[in-house]
Structures are given as structure tokens and as C-alpha cells.
Amino acid sequence: MRVKGGTVTRARRKRIMKLAKGYTGSKHRLFKTAKDQVMKSYTYAFRDRKVNKRNFRELWIARINAGARMNGLSYSKLMHGLKLANIDINRKMLADLAVNDADAFKAVVDEAKKALN
């Protein structure tokens, strides 16, 4: 007797078509093109999870630099001063301080300035 695998095939196709929801044209209608696009989408997602980390680091550095320059230091001098002062605070937290708590950020910058002199 020939086995057609109906339920398994239908479930597999249904899963792919569900993932392809929202795509335009044949990419959400036809199984083969939908499958190709879903695979490509997974590739983009994998790549962009890495890019996202780069983008956020860039944003944090830009914010720290802006805050540091308002307090009379460049970004690189601030980071060097923090290293000399043994202040171990990451860029994400520094950027948050620069944006949301200017007084605390100024205190950190002053410590870095002291260490530089």
C-alpha cells in the first residue's frame, strides 16, 4: 500500500505558511516561495541580532560623548580617566546616566578628570 503522508505534509506546509503570514505576493500564497522566504528571513534575523549589538554600542558611545563634551571632556579622555580611577561602569549604564541623570553623570566625569590630573 502506498503511503502518502498527508497529515505530516499538511502540518509542515501549514507551519511554513503561518510563518510566511504578512509577506507580499506569492511569498505568502505558494509553499515553495514561502519556504524560501522564511529561510531567508531566518538568515536576516540571525545576522541582524549581531548588527543590533553594534548599533546599540554606537548609540551609547554617541550619547556618552555628547554628555562628556558638555562637561569639558572628549569620549576617549573620559574613558581613559575612568580606567585610571578604577571606575568600572559599562557604556550602557554611562549612556543612561548621561541622558537621564545629568548630575550623577557630572560626578562620574569629575572623578575621571581628577584621575587624569
From Swiss-Prot:
Gene3D superfamilies: 6.10.160.10, Ribosomal protein L20 (1.10.1900.20). Belongs to the bacterial ribosomal protein bL20 family. It holds the Pfam family Ribosomal_L20. PROSITE patterns: RIBOSOMAL_L20 (PS00937). This is Large ribosomal subunit protein bL20. GO terms for molecular function: rRNA binding; structural constituent of ribosome. InterPro entries: Ribosomal_bL20, RIBOSOMAL_L20_CS, Ribosomal_protein_bL20_C. GO terms for biological process: ribosomal large subunit assembly; translation. It comes from Limosilactobacillus fermentum (strain NBRC 3956 / LMG 18251). Binds directly to 23S ribosomal RNA and is necessary for the in vitro assembly process of the 50S ribosomal subunit. It is not involved in the protein synthesizing functions of that subunit. One of its GO terms (cellular component) is ribonucleoprotein complex. Keywords: Ribonucleoprotein, Ribosomal protein, RNA-binding, rRNA-binding. NCBIfam families: rplT_bact (TIGR01032).
